[in-house]
Amino acid sequence: MTIPDLRGKQVLITGAGSGIGRAAALAFAQCGAHIIASDIQLAPLEAVKKEVEALGVACLIHAVDVANEAAMKEYADRVHAQVGAVDVLINNAGIAYLGLFLHSDLDHWPRLMNVNLMGVVHGCRHFIPKMIAAGGPRRVLNVASSAGNYPAPSMAAYAASKYAVAGFSEVLKMELAQTQVGITTVCPGIINTAIVTTGAGVAPSVPASQIAKLQAYYVAKGCTPEVVAADMVRAVQKGQDICLTGPGATLVYHLKRLSLKLVRMATIATAKRIGYL
């Protein structure tokens, strides 16, 4: 299902207060789409709303915790009452945690999985039925990660959640094959955002020097969220099943299918160089 013309479409984005979510809101708005933006805090959304409306389209903002199913159901009901079924749903909200598995406690696991995986599940569960009923074409973008395509050391919980998002999206794609709602799995590579160091936390065992090295690597090698957002727009317009975006994303995806051993060797070498190991 392609949606080449986004003018007047309703695009809902979770985690839209910063990073990829904010960039996506602006990118779709530049194409003439109306934006429904949510984040766990309302304050950053106020700035996004001003930026979006300056482009001549409408922007609704809501504070919601995607990990809370009751809150997400209420959010969906409010959105449907305001604009009806959305044309594009982008389940983007996510957090991260940095630290070797055996050197980190498990306290962060439930929250991270609830946001990264269940946030996607809740979004799909409470928005897709109306999308199906309204007819198509419509599209859901579930933001996974290249960390869901290769074994990322020091990011066990994050990688597990993103592997799960990718798997869930593949199954959902099959289940919705007879509808007019398409599913796109978005796999960003090295993106220069603050999610690793501020998205959830860092294990006490991780030294400041390692964090600094990682930040420097992302600044030097990473692309901006705007690159990801532009690729997401194209994925919707062209009806892509998977959106590999940012440095390393395409290489990792195809290299894993060629040789898992090569992926492991390359991952270990890179992880040592940037401070993941």
Description of each model-found segment:
Residues 42-43, 63-74, 106:
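The beta1-alpha1 cofactor-binding region of Rossmann-like NAD(H)/NADP(H)-dependent oxidoreductases
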Residues 145:
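Residue(s) in the substrate-gating loop at a strand-loop-helix junction
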Residues 178-247:
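SDR active-site lid
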Residues 31-47:
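Conserved glycine-rich Rossmann-like NAD(P)H-binding loop of the short-chain dehydrogenase/reductase
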Residues 10, 17-19:
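Conserved glycine-rich cofactor-binding loop
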Residues 100-101, 105-110:
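Substrate-binding pocket helix/loop in short-chain dehydrogenase/reductase
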Residues 124, 161:
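Active-site helix of classical SDR
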